[in-house]
From Swiss-Prot:
It is found in: Cytoplasm; Nucleus. Interacts with CDKN2A. Belongs to the isochorismatase family. The modification N6-succinyllysine is found at K178. Ubiquitous. Expressed predominantly in uterus, stomach and urinary tract. GO terms for cellular component: mitochondrion; nucleus. Keywords: Cytoplasm, Nucleus. Pfam families: Isochorismatase (PF00857). Signal peptide: none annotated. This is Isochorismatase domain-containing protein 2B. The keyword Nucleus applies.
Amino acid sequence: MGAAKASLGRIFPESSILFLCDMQEKLRDRILYFPQIVSKAARMLKVAQMLEIPVLLTEHYPQGLGPTVPELGAQGLRTMSKTSFSMVPPLQQELDKLPQLQSVLLCGIETQGCILHTALDLLDRGLQVHVAVDACSSQSEMNRLVALARMQQSGVFLSTSEVLILQLVKDAAHPQFKEIQKILKEPVTDIGLLGFFQGKKNSLLPNSRT
């Protein structure tokens, strides 16, 4: 097993886990880009299962917010219910069973709430956190973008589902690459993030103005 260097953010199937956060029925009509982010989280789940990466799923106050949406494809997974914004407290025992764990791949909602709190708690544990930005969203675009910036300030790696999947596979000679390639062929749509990353790029340029 290769050791992941924190400065590089490399990820390996044998030392990674996928967190799926609170993609529930009652949030369907409240969250920006909900179908798109669930679709990207679903392909993360498919690839994680193909590569035998552990997956943990939570539901936030399911009595009020309902069950996980079926299109995520998580019907066979054990679901942990929670009231804390962070996923870490209800999943603590599961994490303790994985001494080899180095990297957490994080998808779900809401970015400024449960995703941010989960990411900070995981960083506190000394884990690398990789947020799939195309698989996370919020009710408010401003809260979503500010939360992404806040996580990046704290050391979270911002990525996309495809970037993470290709990091995990690493080689077109991988025995499952052709199947994974089929999963990646769905069209990519803008979900409001191009401006965020364009702004990041401009902030690095001399004499740039916001």
